[in-house]
Amino acid sequence: MANIKSAKKDSIISEERRKKNASQRSKMRTFIKKVRLAISSGDKEKSYDAFKKMQPIIDKYATKGLIHKNKAARYKSILSFKIAKLHKN
């Protein structure tokens, strides 16, 4: 436990940030799951719409530093490839 006043404030701020980051990570994962679910169901339009909603959220969190930019690019690349494959069939 912190004894210095500024250290106590820092621990409170750190806890608030941790909660916010966890919430945002959860939101991002939920959107990714929606895209994966739509792809696995085989619904072309639903998967494309879900992907369009997911993309700006992932980009936003990558620019803010919640996830690494390469991880964001990887998510988008893999899911867009699967959607393109779904549209070919």
UniProtKB/Swiss-Prot annotation:
Any Pfam family: Ribosomal_S20p
BP GO annotations: translation
Disordered: region residues: 1-27
UniProt keywords, alphabetically: Ribonucleoprotein, Ribosomal protein, RNA-binding, rRNA-binding
Example GO molecular function: small ribosomal subunit rRNA binding
The protein's role, per its UniProt record: Binds directly to 16S ribosomal RNA.
Protein name as catalogued: Small ribosomal subunit protein bS20
Organism field: Buchnera aphidicola subsp. Schizaphis graminum (strain Sg)
Lineage: Bacteria, Pseudomonadati, Pseudomonadota, Gammaproteobacteria, Enterobacterales
